[in-house]
Regions:
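Repeat-based blade/solenoid architectures
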Residues: 43-64, 92, 114-126, 166-177, ...
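Hydrophobic beta-strand segments that make up the repeating blades of beta-propeller
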Residues: 75-82, 133-142, 189-193, 263, ...
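Beta-propeller blade termini
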Residues: 62-72, 100, 121-135, 148-150, ...
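Bacterial N-terminal signal peptides
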Residues: 7-17
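Beta-propeller blade repeat segments, especially FG-GAP/WD-type strand-to-loop junctions
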Residues: 22-35, 89-110, 145-159, 203-206, ...
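Asp-box/WD-like beta-propeller blade repeats and closely related beta-sheet repeat scaffolds
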Residues: 110-130, 135, 140-181, 191-218, ...
Length: 566
């Protein structure tokens, strides 16, 4: 995690993108507002990071959070990753938690009933239906053995890690994503690994020359990501090397799946900590080619590898191309890489509030989402430092930090509106992961945010005065994977066309819901919906009313519609 201020100063240069769209969203009807609904929801969870004074590196990273509709009732449930005490220093029994959505704003802890009370040093999570049985499964990353939990379809899960061929691989795994990289209709698994570390190999590091501090990743050797091919029989095979993804110098914290060149094949972006980021282009034949350097996303503008943490992608300016968001260490600012086409990216952060506001904060979880439903993706970043004593050596950097909420103003510009979002939301915390879902079935995206060594927080989206509408799209694959992960959906209104890919992964250690939300402003309907499935199938809907969730089944078109609030 580089501490160099020079990288940030060098990046504060005016950058102009000729492709930035000239349209702008309508003026906001009121301030952003997110109400802390954690207590009212009945969520009682405190992350155990295992810390007891040794300052072991894994303690600083978790926990991940996920939304998963595990019982297929149309309401997103909550899964929370947890750590554990280090061997030889037990203090409490801690496990992940699964909370069932009761449809009335409350949740019930069903962890034990679901068979998920498994102790591990968990870090991240990803959600996907790997066996196409109609039930979303869980893959939980960990320091040590990660776990694959099969959803049995009756409210319970079974740990199938060993049976699936994923056992015996004990690494320092962080983020993960499901991706059908070969488009065979089955979800494959890509797993990020951080560094080569163990308690026995822990090093003594210090910031002030007096006391031990958490070591930075420069102190340890890297570790390659892994790509697991889905064999279609419940097992997976490690194809990392033959796919061209083996790179043992990487120190990966974030994974995003995207199609940056619009060729129909899912590419992979990884954010590396103190190592160059990697952008792997899918060649369409089971292999990938690394393109980050030539694309301009590997380093900062002065050629220095940043400390990449979280990552997300979106077409935030309706250019038709997918751009990148990467959070970095304090004194480095966020990276907002605009996709110029032709495989090239330009960092737009310095010319927008995104860069200026994030210069001193340490970002982790992040995503694009349209919180005010005006049709333009906004940005949320969760912040928090890794060392409680950071202010002893850097007076202007805090351990607990407020998040950043940036409203998309159009024309490539953003405005920070964090302070208008409510005192609880804007409070300083040691933030890590963050995910979104429509928890209350009202068409708005709510937020689940984690704190390292602290509680999780559920924030209900109550944007004051917002009368904007949305259309939500749920996909069911037939030839493609059941979740429709990798499908590209385009929604057209009188104000233009929005494009989203349904993706697993992104943010940091987290999984947002597998339903796409399109804000359409004051429009009461959309003119057209187009779905391009991974199989190549194209489904089209005509005029469709907003204010509902439509289910589209591959090859059949719309098969279900549910109005918000019902």
């Amino acid at each position: 995690m580089k501490r160099k201020l020079a990288a940030a100063i060098a990046s504060v240069l005016f950058v102009f993108s000729p492709n930035a769209q000239t349209q702008a969203p309508a003026t906001a009807k009121g301030p952003a507002e997110f109400r802390d609904a954690t207590a009212a929801a009945g969520i009682k969870f405190v992350h155990n990071n295992g810390a007891y004074g040794k300052k072991y590196l894994p303690e600083t990273l978790g926990p991940g959070v996920a939304f998963i509709d595990y019982d297929n009732d149309g309401w997103p449930d909550i899964f929370l990753v947890n750590g554990m005490d280090w061997p030889g220093h037990p203090a409490k029994h801690s496990t992940p938690k699964l909370y069932h959505n009761n449809h009335d704003g409350t949740f019930t802890d069903v962890t034990h009933k679901a068979g998920l009370d498994v102790e591990m040093f968990g870090l991240g999570v990803t959600v996907g239906d790997y066996d196409n049985d109609g039930n979303d499964d869980l893959f939980v990353t960990a320091y040590g053995q990660s776990h694959l939990f099969h959803n049995n379809g009756n409210g319970t899960f079974t740990d199938v890690t060993q049976k699936a061929g994923l056992g015996g691989v004990k690494e320092f795994s962080t983020s993960a994503a499901w991706v059908d990289y070969d488009r065979d209709g089955r979800l494959d698994l890509v797993v990020a690994n951080y560094v080569t570390w163990s308690p026995e190999a822990d090093l003594y590091c210090t910031m002030d020359g007096k006391s031990k501090s958490y070591c930075t990743p420069e102190s340890y050797k890297g570790a390659s990501i892994r790509l697991w091919h889905n064999n279609g029989d419940g097992t997976f095979s490690d194809v990392t090397k033959q796919a061209g993804l083996y790179e043992p110098t990487s120190k990966t914290l974030g994974i995003a799946v995207l199609d940056f060149d619009n060729d129909g094949w899912p590419d992979i972006l990884i954010s590396n900590d103190t190592q160059p980021n990697k952008l792997y282009r899918n060649n369409g034949n089971g292999t990938f080619t690394e393109k980050a350097v030539v694309a301009g996303v590997a380093f900062s503008e002065d050629g220095v590898a940043r400390a990449g943490m979280g990552v997300d992608t979106a077409d935030y300016d309706r250019s038709g191309n997918t751009s990148l968001l990467i959070t970095n260490f304090s004194n480095q600012m966020i990276s907002l890489y605009h996709n110029e086409g032709r495989g090239l990216f330009v960092d737009e952060a310095p010319r927008s509030e995104v860069g200026r506001a994030s210069l001193l904060t340490l970002g982790f979880g992040c995503f694009f989402f349209d919180y005010d439903l005006d049709g333009w993706p906004d940005i949320l970043v969760v912040n928090g430092h890794i060392d409680p004593d950071i202010q002893k050596v850097q007076a202007n950097v805090k351990y607990a930090e407020p998040p950043h909420l940036f409203r998309n103003l159009g024309k490539g510009k953003f405005a920070e509106v964090t302070k208008t979002a409510g005192a609880a939301f804007a409070a300083a915390r040691v933030g890590r992961s963050v995910a979104y879902a429509d928890v209350y079935n009202n068409g708005r995206l709510d937020i689940l945010m984690s704190t390292n060594g602290g509680p999780v927080s559920l924030f209900k989206n109550e944007a004051v005065g917002t009368a904007n509408h949305s259309l939500r799209v749920k996909l069911i694959g037939t030839k493609s994977n059941r979740d429709g992960i990798g499908a590209v959906v385009r929604v057209t209104t009188a104000e233009g066309t929005q494009t989203q890919m349904l993706r697993s992964g992104s943010s940091y250690l987290s999984a947002s819901e597998l339903v796409l939300t399109f804000g359409v402003g004051q429009q009461s309907k959309v003119d057209a919906v187009e779905i391009r499935w991974p199989s190549g199938q194209i489904d089209k809907l005509g005029a469709t009313n907003a204010g509902q969730t439509v289910t589209v089944t591959e090859g059949k078109g719309q098969t279900l519609a549910r109005q918000f609030g019902k």
